[in-house]
């Protein structure tokens, strides 16, 4: 069962870093939330709103971020290994130093995102994935899927 807006407010006002592994945060409004260093491994964030959220060094291993909005989110150094980012909006997001190995990036939009130093080895994408201008897809070790 997803959290209500009131429950989220209480949760986010607690001590950091947050321990939210496996939590159902689907469709949650987390715009501008500070989730730095949070443990969100295996969490369901499908359809969540995380625009301008701070997720620096957060653990999002195997998290479901399908159809999530992460515009201008700060994901510097975050771990998104094996995360499902399909159909997510990452326009202008800071993914510098992030670990995106084996993540699903199909249909995602990373226009103007910062991928400097990001580990994308084994990540999957399709012809509908939008990359930042001048991003060298071949050199990143990503895998094209149909």
Q: Which residues fall in each region the model found?
A:
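Tandem repeat scaffolds
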Residues: 1-146
